Design a protein with these regions (language model features):
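Conserved phosphate-binding loops in N-terminal lobes of ATP-dependent enzymes
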Residues: 2-71, 76
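Active-site glycine-centered loops adjacent to acidic/histidine catalytic or metal-binding residues
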Residues: 9, 116, 142
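Short glycine-rich anion-binding loops that position phosphate/pyrophosphate groups of nucleotides
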Residues: 13, 70-73, 142-146, 249
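Glycine/GP-enriched mid-protein hinge/lid loop-to-helix segment characteristic of carbohydrate kinases
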Residues: 18-20, 29-31, 40-41, 91, ...
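Adenine-nucleotide phosphate-binding core of ATP-dependent small-molecule kinases
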Residues: 31, 36-57, 61-63, 177-181, ...
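Glycine-rich phosphate-binding loop and adjoining helix at the ATP-binding site
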Residues: 34-37, 41-49, 61-65, 71-135, ...
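Short, hydrophobic alpha-helical segments
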Residues: 52, 56, 286-291
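Conserved phosphate-binding/catalytic loops in two-lobed NTP-binding clefts
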Residues: 107-111, 257-286
Length: 291
C-alpha cells in the first residue's frame, strides 16, 4: 500500500487538505472543508477526524498527519492556545496531538504541528521561488501577519542576526499599536472603514476599484504604504536577497505593492508573490516531517 502524508492548512474559515507523498507531490487535488471554528470541542474534533478519513486515498496508508496551524500554539507539545480570536476557542488547552492520535490510530509522534508561515517558508525554499535564495524573508498576510526567515534553504536558527524571536514580528511596535493590527485582514478592514465608511476586505476593495471607485484605490495605496513601512525595519535588520509574499490578498498585489516593490528594487531584493500559499504550505509540511 502507498504511504501518504495527510497535510492540512488550517484556517479560521476553511481547512484545505490533501494527501502528499514524501517528495512533496500531491496525490489528489486539494479539498476545501468548512472550519466550523466557532463550534464546541467535540464537534471540532469530529470535523478533523472526518477530514483525515476523507482525504486518505483508497489503498493508501497514512504514515503521518501534518497540520499548519495558526498561533498562538504550543507546536512542540501539540497544545492549542488560541483564545479570544473568534476561532477554535473551544480547543484552548486541548492536547490535539493526543486527540488526533486517538482519532486516527497513529502514534502521537506521527502527529505534527507547525506554524503556518513557517510551513509556507519551507515550501517555498524546497519547491518554489526561494530555492536559490541565500537569505530569504517570508511574509503571509491573512488574519494576521505571519513571518519566517530562511538562510541557504533552511529556517534561520534562533539568534541569527536580524531575526526576531521565533521569526515572528507580528507583535513588533508599529504606529500606535503593532504590525498585526495594520498588516492583516482586520487592518485593511479598519483602514477601509476609516477611509470609505465601511469595512471591506481585499476582494471587495478590488471589486470597487474595478468599478472605478477612486477612494477604494486610494485605500489600497495607503495599505501598501503601511505594508512597506512595517517590513522596512525587518528588511534592514536581516538584509534578505529574496522576499516572498503570500496570503490571499496577493491576488490584488498590483493594487498596493508598488511601495514595497520600490524598496526592494533600491535594496536589490528579489520580490516574489505566491498566488496559492496553501499549496506551498502543504508541501512545506512534508519538509517539516522529513527534518
Amino acid at each position: 500500500m502507498q504511504e501518504v502524508y495527510l497535510c492540512l492548512d488550517v484556517g479560521g474559515t476553511e481547512i484545505k487538505a490533501a494527501p502528499l507523498d514524501k517528495r512533496g507531490n500531491f496525490l489528489a487535488p486539494v479539498r476545501h472543508f468548512p472550519a466550523m471554528a466557532g463550534a464546541d470541542r467535540q464537534t471540532l474534533l469530529e470535523n478533523f477526524g472526518w477530514i483525515f478519513s476523507s482525504i486518505c486515498p483508497e489503498n493508501a496508508v497514512p504514515i503521518e498527519i501534518d497540520l499548519a496551524f495558526p498561533g498562538p500554539f504550543d507546536y512542540k507539545n501539540g497544545i492549542c492556545l488560541l483564545q479570544g480570536l473568534d476561532k477554535y476557542d473551544a480547543l484552548y488547552g486541548c492536547n490535539l496531538r493526543r486527540a488526533f492520535s486517538e482519532i486516527s490510530g497513529l502514534l502521537e509522534q506521527k502527529i505534527q504541528f507547525i506554524n503556518d508561515a513557517v510551513a509556507f517558508a519551507l515550501g517555498e525554499m524546497a519547491f518554489g521561488q526561494a530555492t536559490q535564495a541565500g537569505r530569504a524573508l517570508f511574509v503571509a498576510v491573512g488574519t494576521g501577519c505571519g513571518s519566517a526567515f530562511g538562510v541557504n534553504g533552511f529556517l534561520a536558527e534562533e539568534g541569527t542576526p536580524g531575526v526576531p524571536p521565533n521569526g515572528y514580528f507580528y507583535n513588533a511596535p508599529f504606529r500606535d499599536s503593532c504590525v498585526d493590527d495594520y498588516i492583516s485582514r482586520r487592518g485593511l478592514e479598519k483602514l477601509s472603514g476609516e477611509m470609505l465608511g465601511v469595512p471591506l476586505d481585499g476582494r471587495a476593495l478590488a471589486e470597487r476599484i474595478a468599478a472605478g471607485d477612486e477612494r477604494a484605490k486610494a485605500c489600497f495605496r495607503c495599505f501598501g504604504e503601511q505594508l512597506c513601512d512595517a517590513l522596512q525595519p525587518q528588511i534592514e535588520a536581516f538584509c534578505p536577497d529574496t522576499l516572498c509574499m503570500g496570503g490571499q490578498i496577493m491576488a490584488s498585489a498590483a493594487l498596493f505593492l508598488h511601495p514595497l516593490e520600490k524598496l526592494c528594487t533600491n535594496k536589490k531584493i528579489t520580490l516574489y508573490m505566491t498566488q496559492d500559499t496553501s499549496l506551498r504550505t502543504m508541501q512545506g509540511l512534508t519538509r517539516a516531517a522529513s527534518r
